[in-house]
Amino acid sequence: MLSTLHNAWKVPDLRKKILWTIFLVAIFRMGSYIPVPGIDTGALKNLTQSGGLISFYDLISGGSFSRFSLFALSVTPYINATIIMQLLQIAIPKLEQLSKEGDDGRKKIQKITRYAAIGISIIMAYGSYIVIAKYGALKYNSPIDIFLIVLSLVVGSTFLIWLGDQITVKGVGNGTSIIIYANIISALPMTGYQIYSLLIAGKINIVEVILFVGAAIALLAGVIYLYLAERRIQVQYSNKAVGSRMARGQSHIPLSIIGTAVIAIIFAMSVMSFPMTVANFFPNASWAQWITGSSYSPFNSGTWMYIALYCILTIFFTWFYTQITFKPDEMAENMHKSSGFIPGVRPGKPTEIYLEKVLNKVALIGGIFAAIIAIVPVLVANYTSFQDVQFGGTSVLILVSVSLEIMRQLSTQLTMKHYQGFLN
């Protein structure tokens, strides 16, 4: 990794891209400390440490939500809009057809996604206002103050969408991923400080710290191993004349084990948090009190039923998203059109059935590991002394995936530069 960065720094074009990325990330990190006016951030501390979806959003926003800064929503509206658009492409034939029209179709879908992200940011901004008002974090509550809060959050989120595009075009990696990556990295020193504070206060001992760090390293190693792991389906192509002899082409279809884990966890987290969010709007209702406080409620993070349901939903969404991402029927059809076949499997419907069976197995393995990643913060909060420490397997997964993707992109561009130098 370090050698790749060192070699990339020697190439002027890549060095310029790296510097552009650092510059744009610095702008957005400075903006994450610009507060929205009229907010008492001290009252939000318990909210962001309560676990669940809000804690996760605070983590991927680099603590911007707990500070309720201009970038409190981060790129969350854009992520949600992207996921919704991917699902709508399955349900709406016109959108599905648009996605198959090459660059022009993708640009149109991207434009729709951005408009949808702005709409979602308005809804999330107003929802954030309701939440902070419930926790008594508003210094003023006039209509103009509400308008300024919503407007500030929407403008901040829209600016980050634009900034992410600039990083993608002028910098290194995917802009949205880089923003989330930088936010999680920025939260690591605070995590270390929280552990140190617990140790000094006598709430934990050095043995617990060593075990915690060891578990984090083991989780990191497991995520790296499974992220790089893939199930390869061998594909052969019909004989073609190459000079005076016949040659048979070979290739493979790589299926990532945990490629859809992040989205699956976000889906499951959203479903699990939705009843609790609705219940918070009706604190005096008996059904709301049962959802938030009953030991038999599957939406109460302190119960074993919550953990079980969370795992089931994560495995299901991993399978679901794997199916809609790879589409066995289209894979089989494209393979047949290119005169390709899987050894020992007949073309057409048998190939589709075979691909679906392999995808189901891969999705099950990936879903189980995704479920383990998802419940790590819940287990830490319920059964350890590290309740106040923001630590999640999902953040580790994001860090690993973005780091490896950046290295792959730099390696590819370095290879292209070497070839260009050779040709010139």
Mark where each language-model region is.
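N-terminal cationic and glycine-rich segments that engage phosphates or anionic surfaces
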Residues: M1-S99, D104-N424
